């Protein structure tokens, strides 16, 4: 499946305590994207998305808005070859 890609994403702003991770998980599952999401100690959210190029790029775009109560300031994404993540989970 050569059309699969991986995006490693860092989201800054008011993104913790606003259901950002849960909304990310739910949206990724709706789009059949594999990966994970977690809060970082510095206040950012880190996520990995794997799936078809179009779906992953769409998910990275979604991160700019995120959950309804979030206030996203920046989204940094790096693309790479997929590592074979299966399913989508919230990591703690």
Curated annotation (Swiss-Prot):
Pfam families: Acylphosphatase. Gene3D superfamilies: 3.30.70.100. It comes from the Archaea. Residues 6-92 form the Acylphosphatase-like domain. One of its GO terms (molecular function) is acylphosphatase activity. The active site is at 21, 39. Transmembrane segments: none annotated. InterPro entries: Acylphosphatase, Acylphosphatase-like_dom, Acylphosphatase-like_dom_sf, Acylphosphatase_CS. It catalyses: an acyl phosphate + H2O = a carboxylate + phosphate + H(+). Its EC number is 3.6.1.7. Signal peptide: none annotated. Keywords: Hydrolase. It is an enzyme of class 3 (hydrolase). PANTHER family: ACYLPHOSPHATASE (PTHR47268:SF4). Belongs to the acylphosphatase family. This is Acylphosphatase. It comes from Natronomonas pharaonis (strain ATCC 35678 / DSM 2160 / CIP 103997 / JCM 8858 / NBRC 14720 / NCIMB 2260 / Gabara) (Halobacterium pharaonis).
